[in-house]
Amino acid sequence: MMSDSSSEIDVVKTRIPTYDEDDNTILYAYETKPEFVNKEPNIVSDASCNTEEQLRTVNDVLLHCQVIYDALQNLDKKTDVIRRKVSKIQRFYARSLWTNRKRSGYKKHSYRPVKKLKLQKMKKNEVYETFSYPQSYSPTLPVSRRENNSPSNLPRPPFCMEEYQRAEPEEDPILSRTPSPVHPSDFCEHNYQSYYASDGAMYGSSSGLCLGNPRADSIHNTYSTDHASAVSPSVTRSPVGNDGCIAEGNITKHPSTWSVEAVVLFLKQTDPVALCPLVDLFRSHEVDGKALLLLTSDVLLKHFGVKLGTAVKLCYYIDRLKQGKCFEN
C-alpha cells in the first residue's frame, strides 16, 4: 500500500499478479521514481556549500577585526610614547623656569632694562675716570647781535679769579650792603663808575639787588636810561641776562664764602649755554660755595642727574676755581 503522504507523481505503480483465481483482490507495487531519489542528495550538498561559504566569510571578518584591533593597540602605544615625551618636555621647561626665576621685586618687562641701565652707568663712570682735563680746553660762548642801546645790552666786567685771593674770606659777599671798590683796570675801555655807583636803590633794599632777588623782571628798576645811553655801541651784548647786575667785588671773593646766588651767577657768567639749566637745580639743593668746591662727577651724575658732558664741564670749572686761575669770557 502506498502511504497517504506519497504522491502518485513521484512513485511508479505496478500490478502484482495473483495465482488464486477465486480471490478478486488486486495487488500493486509502488516504487519511487529515480529522479526523486537523486534530488535529495543535491539539496544536502547545496546546504553544505552554503555553510562553508558562510564560515569563510565569518573567518575573513574575524581576521579583519583582528587586524583593526592590532592597529588600534599600536596607535595606543604610540600615543602613550608621545604623551611621555610631551610631559618630559614640560617638566624640563618648568624646571628651567624655576632655576632662572627672577628676583622678587623685579617685573618681567623691567628687569632687563634696569640691568642695561646699570651697565651704561658703569661704562659712563669708567669713561669719566679715564677722562683727562687738558689745559687747552676753552668753552665757546655764543655771540648775539647788538640790536639797540637798551639797558639789557650793558656789558659785564671780565670775571677774574685772581681777585678772590686778595679778598677776606670772613666777609659775606651777598649780605654786605656797601659796594666793594672798583678797579678801573679791569674794565676794557669804558667807564663803569656810574654802573657800580652806590645808589640807594641798588644796595639799600633787597628788591633793588638783582642777585639777591632772582625774580627781578628787568634792570630798569636799578638803572636809568642815561646810564644805558652812556655805553658805547661797539660793545657786544652780554650773554647773561637780568641776573648779571652784581658788583665785581662781591663775586671775586673766595669761592668758599659764596652764597647760593653767587654760585648761580658764577654758572651764568662762566658758561650760560651749558650751565644755565643747572640754576634751578642748584637753588633747590641750596648749593653754596663750599658745596660747589666739594662737587664731583659721581655726585653730579648719580644724585643730581646731570648729563655727562655738563658734569665734565662743571668739574673743569671747579678745578680751575680750586687752582685760582683766571679765565675771561
From Swiss-Prot:
InterPro entries on file: SAM, SAM/pointed_sf, SAM_Scm-like
What domain of life? Eukaryota
Phosphoserine: modified positions: S138, S238
The terms under GO molecular function for this entry are: chromatin binding; histone binding
What the entry lists under SUPFAM superfamilies is as follows: SAM/Pointed domain (SSF47769)
Keyword set includes Ribonucleoprotein: no
Which biological process terms from the Gene Ontology are attached to this UniProt entry?
Answer: negative regulation of DNA-templated transcription
Keyword terms of this UniProt record: Nucleus, Phosphoprotein, Repressor, Transcription, Transcription regulation
One Pfam family cited in the UniProt record for this chain: SAM_1
Q: Which residues form the SAM domain?
A: 258-325
- Name its cellular compartments: Nucleus
Q: Where is this region: Disordered?
A: 138-157
Q: What does this protein do?
A: Putative Polycomb group (PcG) protein. PcG proteins act by forming multiprotein complexes, which are required to maintain the transcriptionally repressive state of homeotic genes throughout development. May be involved in spermatogenesis during sexual maturation.
* Protein name stated in the entry: Sex comb on midleg-like protein 1
Q: Which organism is it from?
A: Pan troglodytes (Chimpanzee)
